[in-house]
Amino acid sequence: MRIINIKEIIKTVKELSIEANYYLPDDIKEAIEKAEKNEKWPIANNILNKIIENSHIAAREKIPICQDTGMACVFVDIGQDVHIIGGNLEEAINEGVRQGYEEGFLRKSVVKDPLHRVNTNDNTPALIYYNIVPGDKVKIMVSPKGFGSENMSRIAMLKPSDGLEGVKNFVLETVRIAGPNPCLLYTSPSPRDT
């Protein structure tokens, strides 16, 4: 059994919260660069070019890629042979988010209750997803969920007879309706093992 101190979790989440807002992951950066090279429409090409330029500036200056630094979504794979000591895991993750958003000068936009709209002023609580896996490691990934992208979501009740084709059509229609408005989805450049 491997023992991990909660301080390691806090430090890792703090660092990933900052990195996820400053740097695009390589696969996303490469996909945007490829799209820009292949884009024939000048306006779309210019937009893709600006996204690439913005990501370079953000990385160089160590500033957020986007002003909407989102709600921290934290994905945690916990090995079943891990024992965490020194505190509560959920509290540690939220403390890491709190420290990361403070030290990284990231906008704090999470509210305690959506109806009362009172800001927590530290961007917690994070959305945390746990997955128990074999082994003795903890793997953590942070993905800031920008609220602009959330405003583009839709829901539908499809009939069973719509099948997979109905799902595909709904997704494509949602993308078409949203147009250029949603934010890019990005995550911490690489998940971190602790």
Where do the language-model regions lie?
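Non-transmembrane, aqueous-exposed alpha-helical and coiled segments at domain scale
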Residues: 1-185
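Conserved small/polar residues in nucleotide/adenosyl-binding loops
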Residues: 186-193
